[in-house]
Amino acid sequence: MSMQDPISDMLTRVRNGQAANKVAVKMPSSKLKVAIAALLKAEGYIVDFAVEGEAKPELEVTLKYFQAKPVIEQLKRVSRPGLRVYKKKDELPSVMGGLGIAIVSTSKGLMSDRAARKAGLGGEIICYVA
């Protein structure tokens, strides 16, 4: 059976891994998933990530905890295959009053809502992270 929404699957694996206090979670890899993991690492939400394997590459995400609690409190998919959500640069949302980030897919690649606002770019809102 093919996967309908691989990004939702990735976010769910991270959420479930943190709920079960796992050190790391593995999932099938893709360029978009690696870009999301790189953004989460740059923003400090995960410790690290690595792509393993040649024929069927797997993405391993090392989860981050602070005082035995997950760093990521909320991980919510916004734009999905059945309902795409696009926002102009002036309409980009602020997650939790600026404490969280919205991951935005722009013409210049994936970036946080702050970086997209600074670059003057709008795009597809992939997910909210807080």
Swiss-Prot record:
It holds the Pfam family Ribosomal_S8. One of its GO terms (cellular component) is ribonucleoprotein complex. The keyword Ribonucleoprotein applies. One of its GO terms (molecular function) is rRNA binding. It comes from the Bacteria. Keywords: Ribonucleoprotein, Ribosomal protein, RNA-binding, rRNA-binding. GO terms for biological process: translation. InterPro entries: Ribosomal_uS8, Ribosomal_uS8_CS, Ribosomal_uS8_sf. Disulfide bonds: none annotated. Belongs to the universal ribosomal protein uS8 family. One of the primary rRNA binding proteins, it binds directly to 16S rRNA central domain where it helps coordinate assembly of the platform of the 30S subunit. Part of the 30S ribosomal subunit. Contacts proteins S5 and S12. This is Small ribosomal subunit protein uS8. The lineage of its organism: Bacteria, Pseudomonadati, Pseudomonadota, Gammaproteobacteria, Vibrionales. The gene is rpsH.
